[in-house]
Amino acid sequence: MTTPVLRATPELVAIAWLKTVVGDRVATMLPKPGADGTLSWADGGFVTLVGAGGTPNLYVPLRDPVMGVDCWAVNPGSQKPPWDKAAMLAEAIQAACYDHPAIPKTVTLPTGYPAARVLSAYTTGEHRRITDDASSYARYSIPGLVVVWTEVTP
């Protein structure tokens, strides 16, 4: 039996690009609290994403998925959500989308996956405050982040 070839995926590429913007605090889910109940991401917030659509190019291997992005922040020990901290993460992502000369870059994916070349990144709407969180987390949602990319062939 042969080992399957690992291919770059929209989630992996978007996570890798977002890490160039907000650092190593991006994943598809929020990290679980530690054994002592502490949140490892409380100081700087956290970014989660989920695939929301997009259409691969019909003729060339160019991908342009749309990702739903949520920016999270928390004040441990307080019932007051830190809206400013979550908003700053969303604003950092928006600012990175406007920095057109810095966007084209090759991003490294997890071991075994080929690299991907990000060609463009842009949002499809303004971020908005999500106020229905009973846990007192602050959350801003970006309705669509499009990261245009192609897999780098060795």
Spans of features found by a protein language model:
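Small/polar-rich, solvent-exposed N-terminal microdomains that initiate assembly or binding
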Residues: 1-59, 100-116
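Short, solvent-exposed beta-alpha or beta-beta edge segments that form flexible loop/patches at the rim
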Residues: 25-82, 123-137, 152
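Extracellular/virion structural assembly segments
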Residues: 74-105
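Acidic-leaning, charged glycine-interspersed low-complexity segments
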Residues: 95-143, 152-154
